[in-house]
Structures are given as C-alpha cells and as structure tokens.
Amino acid sequence: MPPAKKAAAAPKKGQKTRRREKKNVPHGAAHIKSTFNNTIVTITDPQGNVIAWASSGHVGFKGSRKSTPFAAQLAAENAARKAQEHGVRKVDVFVKGPGSGRETAIRSLQAAGLEVGAISDVTPQPHNGVRPPKRRRV
C-alpha cells in the first residue's frame, strides 16, 4: 500500500501567497451564459483560457434578482474591468441561453470600453432531447 499523501496546508497568516501574473492579451472572447436564474460572463483568451469572469450572484445579487437585466449589466461591467487589467481591448461575443440579461450584458461590455467584434448565438438546440418542465400554474 502506498504511503498516504499529506494535503497542502493553507498559507500561514502573514505569509505571502503567489500573486496572479498579469497576462497581456489584446484580443479575447466574451462568453455570456444567460439562464432563467443567473447570468455568467467569462472573458477568455483565443485559446479558451479564462482571463476574467463575473456572475450576477458574484456581484452581490441573490434569489430572483440575479436573473434581472441590471444584474447582468453589473456582472458584464465587472468582468470587463478585470479583463482590461490584463490588456484586453477587443472581444468576440458568444451568447448562450434564453435569459433576460443577454442584450444588456453585450451593451455593457461595449460601454465598459471593450470593442465588440462578432456576436454569435451558441445556444444549444436539442434534436428532441429531454422532456421540458411542466407548464406553471400561478
């Protein structure tokens, strides 16, 4: 039987942790996943490595407020600000999902100073996949 490996301990108080290095990526891709409950904005380099991300919940919204266009706007602004620290200037946008924050997130990426190139909808379309949820009775 091999010897048990010890788990890496958390850094001690006062000990410096390794700082994330700043990448210099002028062109990237913004992936916006907008569901009925949340909006997640991820900005990657051309190879798909994540540079910055933000979501409606991460920005500070809880519950049904996460699904609002305003929450998506703040999430996109937050992700754009983080990405600009890494030198991102231009992004191609890939939108996925049926949520209400799709267009708002794209507009706020532009307003935050990122130049938006191509916009593509990559929402997966089922070829008659699983049965949809039953109709709501309110």
Swiss-Prot record:
Q: PROSITE patterns from the xrefs?
A: RIBOSOMAL_S11 (PS00054)
Which residue ranges are recorded for the region named Disordered? 1-27
This protein's assembly is summarised as: Part of the 30S ribosomal subunit. Interacts with proteins S7 and S18. Binds to IF-3.
Q: What is this protein called?
A: Small ribosomal subunit protein uS11
Q: Ranges of Basic residues compositional bias?
A: 13-22
What are the annotated GO cellular component locations?
ribonucleoprotein complex; ribosome
- Disulfide bonding pattern of the chain: none
Compositional bias of type Low complexity: which residue ranges? 1-12
Which controlled-vocabulary keywords does the entry list? Ribonucleoprotein, Ribosomal protein, RNA-binding, rRNA-binding
Q: Which family does it belong to?
A: Belongs to the universal ribosomal protein uS11 family.
The organism's superkingdom is given as: Bacteria
Q: Which Pfam families match?
A: Ribosomal_S11
Respond yes or no to whether keyword Ribonucleoprotein is given for this record.
Answer: yes
User: Which BP terms in the Gene Ontology apply to this protein?
Assistant: translation
Gene3D superfamilies registered for this protein in UniProt: Ribosomal protein S11
Q: What does this protein do?
A: Located on the platform of the 30S subunit, it bridges several disparate RNA helices of the 16S rRNA. Forms part of the Shine-Dalgarno cleft in the 70S ribosome.
Q: Which GO terms describe its molecular function?
A: rRNA binding; structural constituent of ribosome
